[in-house]
């Protein structure tokens, strides 16, 4: 079985370009017994099915990788926005994550 044929356990479309018919997905999948977290670009083929491209990143899904990714996103967002704005817009999400 090829990596691109592995069934997805979970995915969320985090960007969609309707004009180019391209999606960027955050994907959690399992390959050879290891869970992976991927950020990958998908395209719409001629049969109107979404297919993965080689463009993206893939890493083992473990607590440290997930924590570092979350911390990196918060840091990047905080450079553009104040802590107050982050808490106002993402406070409920952050609280739900730590229940």
PLM features: residue spans?
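Negatively charged, low-complexity tracts enriched in Asp/Glu with abundant Ser/Thr
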Residues: 1-19
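N-terminal non-cleavable signal-anchor helices
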Residues: 7, 14-15, 28, 75-77
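Intrinsically disordered, low-complexity segments enriched in small/polar residues
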Residues: 8-9, 14, 34, 40-41, ...
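A generic structural micro-environment signature
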Residues: 12, 20, 32-34, 65-67
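Generic structural "secondary-structure junction" signal
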Residues: 16, 33, 59-61
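Mixed-charge, Lys/Arg-enriched low-complexity segments
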Residues: 53-99
